[in-house]
Amino acid sequence: MGAPALLWPSLLLPWLTVLFGQPPGTLAQTQVCSVNQTIFRVEENTTVSEPLVNIFVPDGLHVTLGPLSTPYAFRIEGKDLFLNVTPDYEENSLLQADVECKRGDAVVVRLEVFVAVLDINDNAPKFSFEIKTFNVSEDTKVNTTVIPETQLKATDADINDILVYTLQEVTPNASKFFSLEGVNYPALKLDQTLDYFKNQNMTFMLLARDTWEENVEPSHTATATLVLNTLPADLRTPWFLPCSFTDGYVCIHAQYSAVVPTGHKLPSPLIMSPGPIYAVDGDQAINQSIIYSIIAGNTDGTFIINAHDGNLTMTKSIPSPMKFTLLIRADQEDMAQYSVTQAIVEARSVTGNPLQFSQSLYYGTVVLGSEAGTAVKDKTFPSEILRIQAQYPGFPDLNSAVTYRVTNSSEFMMNKDIMLTAVPMEEARTIRVEVEASNTVTKDTATAVVEIQVSERERTPTPPEAGGTTGPSSNTTMEAPLTSGTSQRPATTSSGGSVGPFPPGGTTLRPPTPASSIPGGSPTLGTSTSPQTTTPGGDSAQTPKPGTSHPTAPTSRTSTSLMTTSSRSDSTQTPKPGTSQPMVPIPGASTSSQPATPSGSSPQTPKPGTSQSTATGPISLPSTGAGEQGDGQRFSTVDMAVLGGVLGALLLLALICLVILVHKHYRHRLACCSGKASEPQPSGYDNLTFLPDHKAKWSPTPNRKPEPSPKLAQPPLRPPSPMSSSPTPPSSTPPSPQPKASGSPKTVQAGDSPSAVRSILTKERRPEGEGGYKAVWFGKDIGAEADVVVLNEPTADVDSASASGSEGSDDDDPDQKKTLRFGVDADNTYI
């Protein structure tokens, strides 16, 4: 054991000599370069101005940077190692300094210093696009990934950053259709079925953030725009138009019908109802072409349909009445979708439905001097072309085979249903032309007469001034025709015999006779008038309704029309109140007068607040409107408002004065009716005269004997009874005192008849010492409205016969008691 242990030192010595180049004794004595730290950590973007490390360099040695050092990253100043650059993790995450310790040119020792660059969040994420457009089909299934993550992913130079994605809608409600599959996985998926008609395109904003939360620092965000276009899908079948019902998604197809004559083959396509056979692609954005075909019901191949336009034509005639139910199919050109509907064609006999014109006599007009080829205008409606048409009632298909020609004149020719001049019209006259209509299928013919008036063009009235009184305005003028027939455009007349027909808007009728001056006044400068007349026994013109305006003052150099009425009523009706009736003509305008009718009935005077215009035959309806102040008005709206305020104040003062006068003259009656009548009747008394508070204050007079004739005496303390032989209504002044007759009440003798006046006496006598009965006399000739005066008068003596005769007369009539009580309480007041 001891011998091997002694051999180890002798064996290790040569190896140490080779490794260190010198014996172990000299290693302990030699010093080399050294550093106290070889690895450093520095955050990126940090500038280090202090030396990283101090190098220990023994005497006789020096240090330099070796070739293995990071270029330009370090420098050595003396014995200090400095960082020469600002580190950037994205450029170089590890910096190396190779320090060589040399003795002369020989390297004694090599030192390595490392700088690890720490990453910080200093870079924002980036998308590979700013705006990207994607197309999504309308029939894409829900939860399908429409855009993969690789096309939407953003990148960040900060390798350790985790990006968070957010999808924000720009188009309202777009977020209901699309969403991201995850906050860190930006794949786009479909959440709801698309509708091309509602959302043809949607826009989103895609955000990528390099922090989980938004409010931390530092935090960076990148944005990009996504545009999603919805592509239409072939989801709907062809639609036969017009749809009976449609909401844009579903169409209830139209069903067609037609009527054809038996025994005839129509050369042109059938006229279908409600319209021609026509189908469109239900997906309007795709709009595939449609191909038509008949799949059933075409007995004996009677009909054929055009595959491209759907026109249905006959291949042969139908011998007898029958009905065809054709099934029409419409296919898309790509044969992906189709629809079916039915067309019912009924064959009827044309017998009993001859070819005929709408009227036997037409009225046309041509302007004098018209060139050849000028269309004849309708005389009733001169702004419209006269159309002469012959038809088969109930067979519209036969009408297309009708041709027209002029049979008796070379001055006119027919272009379909329009008559044209063949030569210039150089003479004013009236021409009657015969037109023949013939059907090329049935060979039927019909004739009609056209009366054409060649006349000069009438001057068009100037339109009314803006804001002024609105008058009849027109673009063309015409005379009032008296036609026996009707034109193509029906002219309506009211049942009451009112004028008609009415021309359309834009025409005005002008009277054929010159206007006369205004009756009862001097004519205004530049004005003319037109009389408004009625025929014998004439019908009445219609009454203007309240609130309407019937102006009689058109603008300059125009004349109002005559209004002639037919015969059924007795007088023209009076315009109702509430409408304005301007009767002052504007200079250069015309007014109208209203003479009495020949039948003795006269037009009534228009009521205040109405205005009325006149016209002949077919009249144009004048337009009304709230006019502003025109050139011919004298006062502005402000002036009229001030005038209205002044008139209102005057009316208020007049009402106040009237109330004062009524109160002054009738207050005693008002006080009687309102104050006395409402007082409660006292209980326990038949007559208010015997109440203690209202007892008479006079002294009793001695009884006197009756005298044959009354004599004048001193006026009594209380007024005597005003009754006389002839009752008279009361006056506003109190009755004058009358001389009192001696004796019983002989003062009331009316008409010298005992039945003219009757006496009503009460049972009760006055207290002893006052004497007398209480009596009231009523005349039979006094009406209910006459006033009665109740007089309490003391008498000296009363005849026993009068007292006994009136004993019980007052008991049986309580109404009379009430009358007596009221009269006594009023004290000589008329009741």
Curated annotation (Swiss-Prot):
Region (3 X 31 AA approximate tandem repeats): 541-614
Region listing for Mediates interaction with USH1C and MYO7B and is required for proper localization to microvilli tips and function in microvilli organization, in residue ranges: 663-831
Post-translational modification: N- and O-glycosylated.
Residues with PTM Phosphoserine: S699, S721, S725, S736, S753, S802, S804, S806
Subunit structure: Part of the IMAC/intermicrovillar adhesion complex/intermicrovillar tip-link complex composed of ANKS4B, MYO7B, USH1C, CDHR2 and CDHR5. Interacts (via cytoplasmic domain) with USH1C and MYO7B; required for proper localization of CDHR5 to microvilli tips and its function in brush border differentiation.
GO biological process: cell adhesion; cell differentiation; homophilic cell adhesion via plasma membrane adhesion molecules; intermicrovillar adhesion; regulation of microvillus length
Glycosylation sites: N36, N45, N84, N135, N143, N173, N201, N287, N311, N408, N475
Originating gene: Cdhr5
InterPro entries in the record: Cadherin (IPR039808), Cadherin-like_dom (IPR002126), Cadherin-like_sf (IPR015919), Cadherin_CS (IPR020894)
Record keyword Transcription regulation present: no
Compositionally biased intervals (Low complexity): 505-540, 555-572, 797-807
The species this protein was found in: Mus musculus
Region (Disordered), start-end ranges: 452-632, 675-774, 793-831
Cytoplasmic compartment spans: 663-831
Residues that bear Phosphothreonine: T728, T795
Domain named Cadherin: residues: 53-125, 128-240, 252-357, 358-459
GO terms under cellular component: apical plasma membrane; brush border membrane; microvillus membrane; plasma membrane
UniProt Sequence repeat ranges: 541-571, 572-602, 605-614
Keywords: Calcium, Cell membrane, Cell projection, Differentiation, Glycoprotein, Membrane, Phosphoprotein, Repeat, Signal, Transmembrane, Transmembrane helix
Polar residues: compositionally biased ranges: 473-491, 541-554, 573-582, 589-623
GO MF terms held by the record: calcium ion binding; cell adhesion molecule binding
Protein known as: Cadherin-related family member 5
